[in-house]
């Protein structure tokens, strides 16, 4: 089961109450974790998934924000992705530091090698300080409109 938007985690919980899905697919990145409602909804859905042995697949790990007006859209994504190798590494390491999480790769073949390198060289989870600095430097923003 998949979805997009700030209500997707809450909607997945409602769906899991009615149907026995094998996996859920939800956006998860540093910005999502600190959204006013999404982070808590995501964690509640993850807890239900763990209780019911449902796999958690994450998407949008490399989402930087919406494409700026007039920006050259040089990637095959509907949002502006992270491009800097260090930023990609931080984003991938942060998501994969969660036990049992799957990270579905970004849909752009030019960014995929950096994602694979980051996943191959997995180390400890970046600290909150490192991730806050990363988020500020990268200019992370909502890809789902107003947050």
Annotate the PLM regions.
Residues 1-147:
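Beta/alpha (TIM)-barrel catalytic core signal, keyed to glycine-rich beta->alpha loops juxtaposed to Asp/Glu
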């Amino acid at each position: 089961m998949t979805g997009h938007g700030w209500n997707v985690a809450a909607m997945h919980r409602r769906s899991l109450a009615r149907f026995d899905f094998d996996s859920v697919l939800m956006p998860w990145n540093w910005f999502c974790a600190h959204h006013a409602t999404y982070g808590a909804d995501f964690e509640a859905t993850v807890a239900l998934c763990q209780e019911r042995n449902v796999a958690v697949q994450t998407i949008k790990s490399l989402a930087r924000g919406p494409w700026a007006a007039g920006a050259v859209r040089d990637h095959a994504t509907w949002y502006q992705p992270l491009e800097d190798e260090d930023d990609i590494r931080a984003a991938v390491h942060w998501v994969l530091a969660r036990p049992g999480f799957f990270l579905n790769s970004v849909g752009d073949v030019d960014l995929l090698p950096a994602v694979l390198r980051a996943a191959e060289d997995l180390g400890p989870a970046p600290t909150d300080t490192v991730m806050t600095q990363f988020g500020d430097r990268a200019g992370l923003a909502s890809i789902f409109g107003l947050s």
